[in-house]
Regions:
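Structural alpha/beta surface segment adjacent to cysteine/selenocysteine redox centers
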Residues: 24-129
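C-terminal cap of thioredoxin/glutaredoxin-like
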Residues: 5, 9-12, 16-19, 24-38, ...
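Glycine/alanine-rich phosphate-binding loops at beta-alpha junctions
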Residues: 2
Length: 210
């Protein structure tokens, strides 16, 4: 069963993607100014999927063609956009941080709690990594974030170990791939899509056709 609705602004993202954090900030600026803002639906995309073993662990030896020049260019682009969008952000984090467990807990919170609790967890998870430089792959960090929005630690540990959540997360990732999503962030609305940390006026064009 598809989790995609053309009546919503669907966001394909991963917590470990810096451009997803920046794109989120730009999207929120658009939503604040829009006369009739659309509902937003966050959709998982596993940025590390091509490196992931069946057991969920990451193979850091997989060759991805990304060299020092590539990462230098990414850093330059992130520095430029964080200034342009006025986003507080650190780039002092490990490239080996993996968000898989955080995304499982995020899915659990969305299913078990109200939208406000999910949005708070979602926001604080992004900020934990990109503002505070915390390792959101660490179950203790995930539990701390969850407890700060009222989700008990025991539920977090259970969600991380939940095979059903694992299967649903994989299904949603495969669904994104089948739709042709190959990079993130991708923003989709009413059959149209835009990729990258686009500025607020491009959200207006995507959603309102102006």
């Amino acid at each position: 069963m598809s989790t995609i609705s053309e009546d919503e602004l669907t966001v394909f993202s991963d917590y470990v993607c810096p451009f997803c954090y920046l794109g989120k900030a730009a999207m929120e600026e658009y939503l604040e100014e829009a006369e009739d803002p659309p509902e937003v639906e966050w959709h998982v995309f596993d940025l590390r999927g091509y490196k992931r073993h069946p057991d969920g662990s990451i193979d850091h030896d997989v060759e991805d063609g990304k060299d020092d020049d590539y990462f230098a260019q990414v850093r330059d682009n992130v520095e430029r956009l964080k200034d342009e969008y006025d986003v507080e952000m650190t780039l002092d984090y490990s490239l080996e941080v993996d968000s898989w467990d955080a995304q499982k807990v995020s899915l659990y919170v969305k299913q078990a709690y109200d939208e406000e609790t999910f949005e708070e967890f979602h926001e604080r998870t992004f900020k934990a990594l990109w503002r505070d430089g915390r390792d959101i792959g660490d179950p203790d960090v995930i539990a701390d974030i969850a407890e700060s929005v009222g989700v008990p630690e025991e539920e977090v540990r259970d969600a991380i170990d939940d095979d059903g959540l694992e299967a649903e997360l994989k299904r949603r990732f495969e669904e994104a791939q089948e739709m042709g999503v190959s990079g993130i962030p991708t923003f989709a609305y009413d059959g149209h899509a835009a990729r990258g940390a686009i500025p607020p006026h491009q959200f207006e064009r995507l959603v309102e056709g102006t």
